[in-house]
Amino acid sequence: MDYKQLVAAALAPALPDLTQEAILDKIEQPKTSKQGDLAFPTFTLAKTLHKAPQMIASDIVEKVDSSDFEKVVAMGPYVNFFFKKDAFAADILNQVLSNGGHFGDAKLGEAGQVPIDMSSPNIAKPISMGHLRSTVIGNSLANILSKLDYQPVKINHLGDWGTQFGKLITAYKMWGSEAEVKADPINNLLKYYVRFHKEDVDHPEMDDEAREWFKKLENGDEEATHLWSWFRSESLKAFKKIYQRLDIDFDSFKGEAFYNDKMQEVVDILEDKHLLQESQGAEVVDLSKYDLNPALIKKSDGATLYITRDLAAAIYRKRTYDFVQSLYVVGNEQTNHFKQLKAVLTEMGFDWADQIHHIPFGLITSGGKKLSTRSGRVILLDKVLDDAVALAHEQIEAKNPDLPNKDEVADAVGIGAVVFHDLKNERMNSFDFNLEEVVRFEGETGPYVQYAHARAESILRKAGSPEIAATEQTLSDPAAWDTLKLLSEFPATVVRASTEYEPSVIAKYAIHLAKAYNKYYANTKILVEDDELNARLALVKSVSIVLKEALRLLGVKAPDEM
C-alpha cells in the first residue's frame, strides 16, 4: 500500500478543485512524529478559498473519512494524518519480506530501451579519477531504470579515433616493442606518446610522418589499421580489468571510429534540408533561434567535427534501439554541446530529439584543485582503488581480525566506499576527495551503510532461522516507527531518483535508513524472547533487504560480515 496515495485519496473529496496529482505534490513529512506521519499544508488554498489556512484545515478534517487512520487532526494550517501503527507495520514488513530485493520494483518503463553513454575513456590513455563520475553515475542510473522496467543499454563510447593515432603509430614504430605493449599496454603506449611530444619539438618532421600515418589509417592502409586495432584491443583489456573491479559491464564498446562511415549521411541530410551555411570557409548550422552559437559541422579543410559524429551516433542509436530516452552522462562543461546536438537534430526533423537527455555532473577536486589537468595532476583510478582497499584492510584488522574472508570484504568495502562517496554527492556539485574520510566506518560513508547491513545480518544469524513473518504486533520502540516509515518510502525514493537522474537520492536514503536502524539497534534488546520478538526480527530482516538493495542500485556490494 502507498500511504501517500492513501492520504491523497482521503483528501480528494474535501478538495474537489485539486487533482489527485496536485494533492500528492503538496503532501509532506512533518518535522516530528508528534505532528503525525504525513501532513497536508493549506497555505496555498487561502487565496482561492478566501479563508485563513487554519480554518481551511479544520474544514477539511470534518470532510475527511478517517477510518483508514488512527486519527486525522488539524494542527494550525496543516491537516495531520496519524497511521494505525500495527496495521502499517504489518503491511510494510509484509511487502518487504514477500518481495525481498524486488521491493520497490515498478512497471514504469514498459521495457523501453534507454541507451546510456558513459565512462568513455581514450584509447592508450589511463582511466583516471576524472572518469569515475561518468562511470558510476551511469551504472547506477542503469540499475535504477532497470528496477523500474526500463531496458538500459550501457554504451562505452570509446575515444578511439583522431590525429593522435598517427602520432602513436609513429612513436611505436620508432621506439615501441610488442612485448612492452602486451605487458603494460596503457603505461607503455602513453610513454611512447609523451616521448613523441618531447622529441617533435626538435624534430618537426615527426609531425609530418604522424600526419602521413593518420592519412593512411583514414584510407584503410593495412599496417596502420592493424596497429590501430591492436592498440585499441590491448587498451580495452586493461580498461576491462578496472571495470571488473568496479563490477561494471557494458553492452557496447562502439566508439568514435564506429561512426566514420556514418557521418556522410548526416552531412547529406543537412544539405538536403538546406541547413548548412558557409562561415569563414567552414560549414555550420545556424542555431540563433535556439539562442545558441552556430554548430560547426565541417572545418574549412573538409574535416568533420565532434558534433557530426555525435549526430551520427544519435541517429544510429535511435534506429538500433528505438529508445524511449537516450542519456549522455558527461561533465557539465559539455552542456552547450548537447544543447546544440538536440537543436540540430530538431532542425533535421527528428521529433525524438526531446528524448535525449544530457546528465551533467561536477568535478572531483583534491585540495580544491581539479584532479585531471594538463599540469600533471592525473590521479589513476586503479591506484585510488588499491589505496582504498588497503585502508579498508587496516580498519578490518583493527575491528575484526578474525573475519574469515578479509580480502573479499576489504575489496567490497574499499571500492564500495569510493563509489558511494561519489554518488552521495548531488551530481551537479563538485566535491573534494579525501580517501581517509571516504573509507571511514563512521559518518555518512559507504562503510557506515555496509556496516549497518552487516550488523542486521549478524542479528539474524544469532536468531538462528525462525520463521519470520509480518503480523500485526506492536513495535513499541519509537525508533522502530521511524525505521518503518523510512522502509515505506523506498519505492517512491527509487522513482524520484529515476525522474531526477540523481543517484544521490538513493545514497542519502541509505544513510538515513542506516542511521534510523542503528538508533533502533542501540535502544532495543532485539533478541529477547517475548511477544514482540517476531516483529523485531521482521523489522531487522526488512532493513537488511532494503539496505542491500539500495547499495546494489548504487553499484556497491553489501557484505554479510564485516
Curated annotation (Swiss-Prot):
Annotated Pfam families: Arg_tRNA_synt_N, DALR_1, tRNA-synt_1d
Catalytic activity, EC: 6.1.1.19
UniProt keyword terms in alphabetical order: Aminoacyl-tRNA synthetase, ATP-binding, Cytoplasm, Ligase, Nucleotide-binding, Protein biosynthesis
Localisation per UniProt entry: Cytoplasm
A GO term from the CC aspect: cytoplasm
GO biological process: arginyl-tRNA aminoacylation
A GO term for molecular function: arginine-tRNA ligase activity
Keyword Kinase appears in the UniProt entry: no
Main subcellular location: cytoplasm
Sequence motif: 'HIGH' region, positions: 121-131
InterPro entries, alphabetized: Arg-tRNA-ligase, Arg-tRNA-synth_N, Arg-tRNA-synth_N_sf, ArgRS_core, DALR_anticod-bd, Rossmann-like_a/b/a_fold, tRNAsynth_Ia_anticodon-bd
Source organism superkingdom: Bacteria
Database matches in SUPFAM superfamilies: Anticodon-binding domain of a subclass of class I aminoacyl-tRNA synthetases, Arginyl-tRNA synthetase (ArgRS), N-terminal 'additional' domain, Nucleotidylyl transferase
First-tier enzyme category under EC: ligase
Catalyzed chemical reaction(s): tRNA(Arg) + L-arginine + ATP = L-arginyl-tRNA(Arg) + AMP + diphosphate
PANTHER family to which the protein is assigned, alphabetical: ARGININE--TRNA LIGASE, CYTOPLASMIC, ARGINYL-TRNA SYNTHETASE
Family label: Belongs to the class-I aminoacyl-tRNA synthetase family.
Subunit structure: Monomer.
Name of the featured protein: Arginine--tRNA ligase
Species per Swiss-Prot/TrEMBL record: Lactiplantibacillus plantarum (strain ATCC BAA-793 / NCIMB 8826 / WCFS1)
Taxonomic classification: Bacteria, Bacillati, Bacillota, Bacilli, Lactobacillales
Gene name linked to the record: argS
